[in-house]
């Protein structure tokens, strides 16, 4: 299948973009329309790479607005985990479909997820056409029996994911160092190396986590992981607010990827001094995440970019920190590098994972800088008009096929879980 986008803005130039199969084939003005190609009029639109959300919990869209304004551990132990214990696999599927819809409508084409029932999330992703790396979440607080079950399920899920399209990739998701034992973390590392998959881990999110790690192990979180021998290019760590210079050196040395989640870090008061500039100087691969809707309330990567940029400026008292271009890079190319996919750029040979931005929305006028306008002036749900993933149109004219049914079913499940939807 071919798609030709005509007269679209790309790098300050009006041009055409030809998609053949699932790749961007040509970028040039006045391209000839291939026989049978679908033509999209790009007038008054800009083509941009799809955003890559490198940390979220998709099905937690169902928790939006529940348990707000609470500290992390009270929020988890008294609000989130009790409801999750009541959720069915179908609930996860419904919440994940709502998440995929929300991400499509705000220009996200790929995401890294961590949640229970990953096959249900995979089913939702398959149906709505996104690209995703989906983690099986491991906890072993239940002792040796639970740890053994998680190891068994890791192998089972790895095999089960082979039934899905190549847009969907299996990863391991040990929840955190305070919910997963050192032995289980070492299992995850061994599994990741043997099967060439990623490990998705919360790390150094709060000061309390760091203090408890020092109390239990005599080491801060990053040093603890180094002692366990699991720092590697397979590891993706989210939050990483409470780290020192030596720990950042270790992350860089072992090619660990780091994901900044500004919304949840601020909302839960986990910490705000994310050391973006220091990590960037060390060559650490940096991504941007929305986190789940239970802690950030939306999955809009455009809003996440604005928060990441402004937060970095605010705590440093430096208007030149966390520049719009750098944050935009982390939300696109940075995410692609972390997940090792040929995406994140509008260039010939790249995956056709892209969005068309409506340049006629008021907050994008005038267009002195598209990058600055995207990071500082708008939201994805306001300005994204069309989304193409893997060479297939998944949203056009702000409409996703079946969106009414997705929203209605999510409301029904939320009413059962929370009493209202």
Q: Which residue stretches match the model-derived regions?
A:
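Alpha-helical scaffold segments that flank or form the walls of functional sites
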Residues: 64-130, 153-164, 411-419
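Histidine/acidic-residue-rich catalytic or RNA/ligand-binding cores of hydrolases
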Residues: 207-219, 247-249, 269-279, 296-313
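His/Asp/Glu-enriched, well-ordered alpha-helical/loop segment
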Residues: 227-234, 276-361, 375-379
């Amino acid at each position: 299948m071919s798609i030709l986008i005509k007269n679209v803005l790309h790098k300050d130039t009006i041009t055409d973009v030809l998609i053949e199969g699932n790749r961007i084939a040509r970028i040039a003005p006045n391209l000839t329309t291939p026989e049978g190609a679908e033509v999209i009029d790009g007038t008054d639109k800009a083509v941009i790479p799809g955003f890559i959300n490198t940390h979220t919990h998709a099905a937690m869209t169902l928790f939006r607005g529940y348990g707000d304004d609470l500290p992390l551990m009270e929020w988890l132990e008294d609000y989130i985990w009790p409801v999750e214990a009541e959720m069915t696999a179908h609930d996860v599927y419904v919440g994940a479909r709502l998440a995929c819809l929300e991400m499509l409508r705000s220009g996200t084409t790929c995401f890294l997820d961590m949640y229970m029932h990953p096959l249900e999330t995979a089913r939702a992703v398959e149906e709505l056409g996104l690209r995703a790396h989906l983690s099986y979440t491991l906890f072993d607080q239940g002792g040796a029996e639970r740890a053994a079950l998680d190891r068994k399920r890791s192998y089972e899920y790895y095999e089960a994911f082979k039934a899905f399209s190549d847009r969907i990739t299996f990863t391991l998701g040990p929840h955190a160092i305070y919910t997963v034992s050192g032995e289980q973390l070492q299992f995850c590392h061994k599994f990741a190396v043997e099967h060439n998959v990623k490990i998705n881990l919360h790390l150094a999110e709060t000061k309390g986590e760091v203090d408890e790690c020092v109390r239990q192990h005599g080491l801060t979180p990053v040093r603890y992981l180094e002692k366990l021998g699991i720092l590697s290019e397979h590891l993706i760590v989210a939050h990483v607010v409470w780290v020192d210079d030596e720990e950042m050196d270790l992350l860089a040395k072992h090619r660990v990827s780091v994901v900044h989640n500004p919304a949840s870090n601020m909302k839960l008061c986990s910490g705000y001094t994310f050391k973006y500039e220091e990590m960037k100087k060390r060559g650490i691969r940096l991504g941007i995440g929305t986190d789940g809707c239970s802690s950030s309330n939306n999955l809009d990567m455009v809003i996440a970019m604005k928060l990441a940029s402004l937060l970095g400026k605010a705590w440093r008292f430096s208007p030149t920190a966390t520049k719009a271009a750098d944050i935009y890079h982390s939300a696109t190319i940075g995410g692609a590098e972390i997940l090792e996919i040929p995406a994140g750029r509008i260039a010939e040979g790249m995956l056709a994972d892209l969005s068309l931005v409506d340049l006629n929305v008021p907050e994008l006028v005038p267009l002195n800088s598209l990058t600055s306008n995207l990071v500082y002036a708008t939201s994805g749900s306001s300005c994204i008009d069309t989304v193409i993933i893997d060479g297939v149109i998944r949203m056009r004219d702000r409409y996703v096929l079946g969106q009414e049914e997705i929203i209605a079913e999510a409301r029904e499940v939320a009413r059962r879980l929370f009493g209202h939807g």
